[in-house]
Amino acid sequence: MTDCSRCAGTNASGPNYWSERIRDIVDFPKPGIVFKDITPLLSDGPDFASALDEMAQPWRTTPLDAVLGIEALGFILGAALARELRTGFVPVRKPGKLPGRTLIREYALEYGTDRIEMHEGALPRGARVLIVDDVLATGGTLRAALGLAAQLELEIVGAAVLVELLALQGRQKWADDVPLLATLSF
C-alpha cells in the first residue's frame, strides 16, 4: 500500500473544490490553446464519484433509454453516468472506429472540419437519450452529436458536460429547446 494523501479524498467537495483539481495545460494541443485537463479529478475516486453524482443529479427522474458518450473523455463520463442512471450507453466515435453501418456527421472546427459517427440502429426511433461530453468549448462536437441523434430520430432530452468554457460561447450555438447542463464553468 502506498502513502498517497491526495488519493484518500478529502472532506472538501463541490464545484469550487473540483475546479481546483482541473489543471491548465498551456499550448496544448496547439500554440495559443489552454487545455483544461480533467484527468486529475478523474484519478481521485471520491472526487470523481462526487462530481459524477453532481452531473447525474438533474437527470435522475428523467426517463432515459441511453446515454450517448462522445469520444474520448465523454466515453468515461458517459459510461459512468449511464451506470449511475441505470440506462444504456452508446458511443459516438471518430470516423472509422465503429464496425458495421454508421451515420457520419461533419462539423466545423476553428480551422477545418472533423467528423463523428454512430451505429445505424444503435437505438430504436424515439429512444430518449442524454448526450454527454467532458468539455463544452465552441459547441461543434455537441451540435454534431445532436444532429446524429436527430438523424436517427432519437428524442434528445438534454446534454451534460463536466466543464463549460464560457469565453468560447458554445452554449450560444446550442439548441434552445434542449437543456444543456454544465457541472463546472471557467
UniProtKB/Swiss-Prot annotation:
Q: Name one GO cellular component term.
A: cytoplasm
Official protein name in the record: Adenine phosphoribosyltransferase
* Pathway the protein contributes to: Purine metabolism; AMP biosynthesis via salvage pathway; AMP from adenine: step 1/1
According to UniProt, the reaction catalysed is: AMP + diphosphate = 5-phospho-alpha-D-ribose 1-diphosphate + adenine
Subcellular location(s) of the protein? Cytoplasm
Where is coiled-coil annotated? Answer: none
Biological role:
Catalyzes a salvage reaction resulting in the formation of AMP, that is energically less costly than de novo synthesis.
Q: Could you tell me which HAMAP family the record lists for this protein?
A: Aden_phosphoribosyltr
Family, per entry: Belongs to the purine/pyrimidine phosphoribosyltransferase family.
Xref: InterPro entries: Ade_phspho_trans, PRibTrfase_dom, PRTase-like, UPRTase/APRTase
Q: Which SUPFAM superfamilies match?
A: PRTase-like
| Pfam families per UniProt | Pribosyltran (PF00156)
UniProt keyword list: Cytoplasm, Glycosyltransferase, Purine salvage, Transferase
**Its quaternary structure?**
Homodimer.
According to the UniProt entry, what is the EC number of this protein? 2.4.2.7
Write out the GO MF terms: adenine binding; adenine phosphoribosyltransferase activity; AMP binding
Q: Which organism is it from?
A: Xanthomonas oryzae pv. oryzae (strain PXO99A)
Q: What is its main location?
A: cytoplasm
- What are the recorded Gene Ontology BP terms? adenine salvage; AMP salvage; purine ribonucleoside salvage
Q: Which Cys residues form disulphide pairs?
A: none
